[in-house]
Swiss-Prot record:
GO CC annotations, alphabetized: DNA-directed RNA polymerase complex
BP-aspect Gene Ontology terms: DNA-templated transcription initiation
Name recorded for this polypeptide: RNA polymerase sigma-54 factor
Record InterPro entries: RNA_pol_sigma_54, RNA_pol_sigma_54_core-bd, RNA_pol_sigma_54_DNA-bd, RpoN_core-bd_sf
Organism: Vibrio anguillarum (Listonella anguillarum)
Amino acid sequence: MKPSLQLKLGQQLAMTPQLQQAIRLLQLSTLELQQEIQEALESNPLLDVEEAYEENATADVHSINEEKEASAEVLDIEPQDSSDLIEKSEISSELEIDTTWDDVYSANTGSTGIALDDDMPVYQGETTQTLQDYLLWQLDLTPFSDTDRSIALALIDAIDDYGYLTVSLDDILESFADENIELDEIEAVRKRVQQFDPLGVASVNLQDCLLLQLATYPASTPWLEEAKQLLIQHIDLLGNRDYKLIIKETKLKEEDLREVLQLIQQLDPRPGNNISTEHAEYVVPDVSVYKDHGKWVVTINPDSVPKLKINQQYAALGKGNSADSNYIRSNLQEAKWLIKSLESRNETLLKVAKCIVEHQRDFFEYGEEAMKPMVLNDVALAVEMHESTISRVTTQKYMHTPRGIFELKYFFSSHVSTDSGGECSSTAIRALIKKLVAAENTAKPLSDSKIADLLADQGIQVARRTIAKYRESLGIAPSSQRKRLL
């Protein structure tokens, strides 16, 4: 076959730079889009921010400063004693028996009270330093001999995120084989490290951690000795919630055991968790939903991103054929493309958000249990867009509603068939499971099979394994772990 050149006339789809930019902006989150716009403002002199947006931002800054000054004045006039603050941060004595240690100890609860000095490292959920960093900082402030300091460093290095040692003391002793160090000396240093904040770090097990915390309580604390004996002799039964056997073994009355458990629940089984190593993630709602005269209204959040305009003074300099004029015209075209892409993004986002609100109207009226099943294709057909476009516009985009802030993808869920031939959203089923568990008899918690039967009575057929999966996604423990002491 002889090679030759041929001309062929045809049509094909081509993605223009403008379309590429519009698609890229569509999938950016609000914070990413703000950064993109800021970079464009810095690189393109033809772009400006509209004055109304700047005035709003300035007003917000002034408002924040005024609030800070007012707060400072209140603090100056009404100083509060640190002991009062500590008392306010103490755990309520009305906690239910089944409350777990993780539920009792929140991120802002510490073993040494509240740090009031701004220069002091604050670990109550506000710092991003690691647990090891915080312990090393305290080590530098504590007098140790060179040998003991080396041992303390080895201990701190072996502590996991929960605050427990990951190696045995014998293993640490072996690491000092070349030095004349005894196991008793390592244990003595460990005891000193355990007094660091948060109290209980460097413990070898849960029993060691909890007993150390109990040792700091005043001797006059009610039920203190009973709590210590329960942890020493029956911690396994306590973990299994075998209250009947505990009563039999300890000879405690049911009311007395209740008091002992309430004391133990004030302890922190994972002291290292008080150190937060994760940065807080902030979201800015892209759209707002509110009810006005009985109708649900959807609007774009005007403060989510700056509103751009063309700098007309620079644009007027684009006439002519000089290099400067060509530069102005090039940037002018890019500025127009960006503004048009942002307008297109807002139009698409608003259209999709309105469709979601219309489809999930019952959710906004009645809550999660009224959520309807909905997939991306349902919205794509309604707004006459491709499913991939709907996926982009609902990813990392947030809606502010009277019920809270939700990612747009939250409103999409699979469906489960009902006996009546209808469909029920998996989100609604999760809400029903949460409601059933909240109302269950705590002496005899509902098993997954029983929950499936109760849903079947409502015409919703769900397999036991599906119930277990939904329950775990809600962070609800199995029935064996939800049992409480009456």
